[in-house]
């Protein structure tokens, strides 16, 4: 079951209309401080469920237990940005605030982008990595690689290793190069993991 999400769209810069979408958890469940409940003589059971829902509870002994006294502060809402074709990563600066993951195209390395010129309106790995680093986004997933970058190094003059090397030169967070059918999970701890393949 998916949590409630807030979705926002940001127009990107490309030859045709392209958009980025940010997905932010709208409601983050607060955790009960069970040690404090036990220490206060509140036995586990239906009362805990009511407190978890933010409702005060009248105990059989006549005490009123206030939910706010036993709920830990909520964790930070998780936020993911998924962008389409875009030659200006900085258009996402407003959305990148507090983002946990940025998924963005990195079609070329800087060298190939300079050789091709601005016409195709795509980003280089360095452009995206510099942006993600400046925005303090802890997880970056690069996508939409030009076919000139072969999947296996040594089979041609360019490989995905070139994209990865360029990105790592500008970005110190968790970096992934997405492959077709990859699935990622963002844990409640903010750690991005490659999910078990289908």
Language model segments and positions:
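Active-site-proximal loop/helix segment associated with metal-binding centers of metalloenzymes
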Residues: 1-82, 86-94, 101-103
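Binuclear metal-ion centers of metallo-dependent hydrolases, dominated by the metallo-beta-lactamase
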Residues: 88-198
């Amino acid at each position: 079951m998916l949590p409630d999400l807030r979705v926002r769209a940001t127009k990107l810069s490309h030859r045709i209309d392209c958009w980025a979408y940010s997905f932010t958890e709208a409601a983050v469940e607060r955790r009960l401080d069970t040690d404090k409940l036990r220490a206060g003589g509140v036995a586990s059971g239906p009362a805990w469920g009511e407190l978890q829902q933010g409702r005060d509870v009248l105990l059989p002994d006549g005490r009123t237990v206030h939910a706010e006294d036993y709920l830990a502060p909520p964790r930070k809402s998780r936020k993911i940005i998924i962008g389409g074709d875009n030659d200006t990563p900085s258009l996402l600066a407003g959305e990148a605030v507090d983002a946990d993951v940025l998924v963005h195209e990195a079609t070329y390395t800087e060298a190939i982008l300079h050789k091709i010129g601005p016409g195709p309106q795509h980003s280089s790995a360095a452009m995206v990595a510099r942006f993600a680093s400046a925005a303090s986004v802890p997880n970056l997933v690069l996508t939409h690689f030009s076919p000139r970058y072969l999947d296996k190094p040594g089979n041609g003059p360019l490989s995905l290793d070139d994209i990865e090397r360029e990105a790592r030169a500008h970005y110190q967070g968790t970096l992934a190069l997405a492959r077709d059918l990859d699935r990622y999970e963002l844990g409640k701890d903010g750690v991005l993991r490659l999910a078990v393949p289908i």
